Structures are given as C-alpha cells and as structure tokens.
C-alpha cells in the first residue's frame, strides 16, 4: 500500500462485498517505515475472510532503502510492522503454511519471505514453507514473481503462486508497460503446464504519486474442483 495518497483508495467495503473465503496480501504493505501503516489500520482491520486474512513480506517491508542508525533499529521497525499486522487480525506466513479444510478437501496455503533477484533481498525458504504439504493442492504467496521461474517451477509442484512487486511500473498504455522489460511475468495470469502464477499490480505507488493505466486493483480468484 505504502503512500497511496488517501485512505479512500482502499475500499474495505468492496473487498468484503466479495464474501471471500480468504483474503491474501502479497507484500509491500509500506514503502519505508512501519508508521506509514498507521492511518490505514482502521480500514485494513475491517477486511475479513471466512478463513482469515494472510500476508507475506515484500522487499520494502524490510525497509532497506533508508539509512538506519543501527541494525537493531531496522529490525525494530520490521517487528513493529509485524505487530501491527497481527493487531489487525492478519497472519504473516514467513516460510510457513496453514492447512485449510473445505467440504472434505484440504488446501495448503504457504507463504515465503521475500525471494528476489539481486539487489532485492532473498530470505525465502520454499522447502521449509512447503514441508508437510505433500499431495495437497498448494497456493503459494511469494512477493516477487521472479521466484516462479527461479525456484517454484523447477523445485516444487505448487499449483498456484500469487505475487505482486511489479506495480506494472505504474504505467500501462494500450496493454504496454515498461515492466515487461524487467519482469517477464509482470501483470495477470501466467501458466506453465499445470502450474499457474498470478501477478497483482497493487494499490499504491512508489516514487511518483500517480498511476497511468496501471490502476489500483484487487483480484478475485475462484478455484473450481475438476
């Protein structure tokens, strides 16, 4: 979310109107510091899912882009962000998973810490996150879509990965975005065999306080048993 300019950009009523089983947030809740979240907490804590609201950390959530006096101060900022999410009723999946049960079926929802190519941080541990999910349908939240080709496709059977990160570079004109030159998978649905990736382009902005064509979005995904 970061600096979205106004809390009106976040429509908790629109999200709740979907009556979702799960609400998932794939990272970069702030741009630099945990206090950016404070004005949005009254809205975000109203977002509900029948089976909960889950999140993962993105590269900005670690606050690596500002100068901290000490490593301890930076760590305290991250812990503050985690605490604020917990207070909102969100559960962060840091290289972990939960098992969800519906009508006799089980789905594994897993999440990893940011797993990016340099210079972005890589704290993700995919194998740890998936341990114990063998044979289940798996949804993986991983902030950076480059994780898909780097590790998820070659080393796992995750059926659906959900990412963010690209923001579509906040610009899209007639379907063209410069994000395509940096991220092969930068917006929407991608498939390789029986595995899929969906990249959501987020709500807020970074550096430039505007979006052109790459409008803020939420994504509604319906899973069908086949």
Where are these regions (language model features)?
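Core catalytic region of metal-dependent phosphoesterases/phosphodiesterases
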Residues: 11-101
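Conserved beta-sheet core of the metallophosphoesterase superfamily
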Residues: 45, 139, 145-222, 226
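Beta-strand-turn-beta hairpins that frame and shape the catalytic cleft
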Residues: 90-91, 97-109, 131-136, 191-196
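Acidic/histidine-rich helix-loop elements
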Residues: 6-7, 30-35, 63-76, 118-121, ...
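Active-site-proximal beta-strand elements of phosphoester/diester hydrolases
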Residues: 6, 106-115, 139-143, 196-201
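Short, conserved loop/helix-junction motifs that constitute active-site signature segments
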Residues: 18, 44-50, 131-134, 152-156
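Catalytic metal-binding/acid-base residues of hydrolase active sites
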Residues: 29-30, 60-61, 97-98, 113-115, ...
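Single conserved hydrophobic/aromatic residue that forms the stacking wall/gate
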Residues: 1-5, 9-10
């Amino acid at each position: 979310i970061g600096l979205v300019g106004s809390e009106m950009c976040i429509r908790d009523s629109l999200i709740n109107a979907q009556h979702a089983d799960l609400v998932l947030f794939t990272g970069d809740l702030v741009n630099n510091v945990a206090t950016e979240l404070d004005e949005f907490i009254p809205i975000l804590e109203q977002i509900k899912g029948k089976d909960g609201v889950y999140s993962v950390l993105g590269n900005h959530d670690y606050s690596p882009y500002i100068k901290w006096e000490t490593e301890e101060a930076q760590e305290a900022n991250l812990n503050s962000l985690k605490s604020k999410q917990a207070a909102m009723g969100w559960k962060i999946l840091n290289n972990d998973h939960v098992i969800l049960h519906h009508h006799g079926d089980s789905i594994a929802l897993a999440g990893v810490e940011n797993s990016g190519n340099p210079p972005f941080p890589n704290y993700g541990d995919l194998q740890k996150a998936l341990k114990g999910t063998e044979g289940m349908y798996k949804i993986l939240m991983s902030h950076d879509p480059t994780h898909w080709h780097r590790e998820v496709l070659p080393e796992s059977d995750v059926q659906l990965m959900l990412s963010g990160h690209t923001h579509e570079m906040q610009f899209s004109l007639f379907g063209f975005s410069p994000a395509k030159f940096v991220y092969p998978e930068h917006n929407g649905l991608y498939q390789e065999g029986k595995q899929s990736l969906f990249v959501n382009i987020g709500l807020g902005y970074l550096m430039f306080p505007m979006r052109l064509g790459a409008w803020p979005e939420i994504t509604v995904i319906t899973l069908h048993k086949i």
